[in-house]
Curated annotation (Swiss-Prot):
Family: Belongs to the endoribonuclease YbeY family.
Native organism: Limosilactobacillus fermentum (strain NBRC 3956 / LMG 18251)
Residues noted as binding Zn(2+) in the record, renumbered to the chain: H123, H127, H133
Gene from which this protein is expressed: ybeY
This protein's record includes keyword Cell cycle: no
Listed cofactors: Zn(2+)
EC number(s) recorded for this UniProt protein: 3.1.-.-
GO process annotations (BP): rRNA processing
Name of the protein this chain belongs to: Endoribonuclease YbeY
First-listed, main subcellular location of the protein, grouped into a coarse class: cytoplasm
A Pfam family recorded for this sequence: YbeY
Residues in the signal sequence: none
C-alpha cells in the first residue's frame, strides 16, 4: 500500500511516530488483505487545524483526535473491464490525526503515546475500509479486529 505522509505539526511529530504509523498501517492493510496498489494519505496536524476540519466537515467546533475521509467507490469504474480495474490504484481516503490529542489522551488514559497513536491509526484505517461502530454488533467486530491488530504491534492495553 502506498502511504502519503504529511507533517503539519511544526516539529512535534517524532521520527519514531512516523515509523510507527508506517508499520501500523502496513500491518492493518495486510490483515484486511488491502490490495498492494491501494493508496491513502495520512496527515499529522495540531489541534487548531483539526478543530477547523472538524468544524467545516462535521459541524463540531472543537478539536478531535482523528478524522477519516473515506473515498467512495466510483460507479463509473464499475463499467470498466475487470482487467483495467485491476490495474487502477485503489484510493482508500485520508486520515488526519492531531498529534496534540495523541499526547493529551495518552496522559488522560494513562498509557503510552505509542499505544494512543497506534489506536488512532488502526481505528481510522478501519473506518476507511468500511468498518463502523454505529450498531453493537458492528462495534464488537470493529473493536475486536482493532485490538487484534494492536496486539500484533505490541501495543496491547
Amino acid at each position: 500500500m502506498e502511504l502519503q505522509l504529511r507533517d503539519h505539526t511544526e516539529g512535534k511529530l517524532q521520527p519514531s511516530q512516523e515509523r510507527l504509523a508506517e508499520k501500523a498501517l502496513a500491518q492493518a492493510a495486510e490483515r484486511l488483505d488491502v490490495p498492494e496498489q491501494a493508496e491513502m494519505s495520512l496527515t499529522f496536524v495540531l489541534n487548531p487545524e483539526i478543530r477547523e476540519l472538524n468544524r467545516d466537515y462535521r459541524g463540531i467546533d472543537r478539536a478531535t483526535d482523528v478524522i477519516s475521509f473515506a473515498i467512495e467507490d466510483d460507479d463509473d469504474l464499475a463499467n470498466l473491464p475487470a482487467e483495467i480495474r485491476a490495474e487502477l490504484p485503489v484510493e482508500l481516503g485520508d486520515l488526519v490525526i492531531s498529534i496534540d490529542k495523541v499526547t493529551e489522551q495518552a496522559l488522560f488514559l494513562n498509557h503510552s503515546a505509542d499505544r494512543e497513536l497506534g489506536y488512532l491509526l488502526v481505528h481510522g484505517f478501519l473506518h476507511l475500509n468500511g468498518y463502523d461502530h454505529e450498531e453493537p454488533a458492528d462495534e464488537e467486530k470493529m473493536f475486536t479486529l482493532q485490538e487484534e491488530i494492536l496486539d500484533g504491534l505490541g501495543l496491547s492495553r
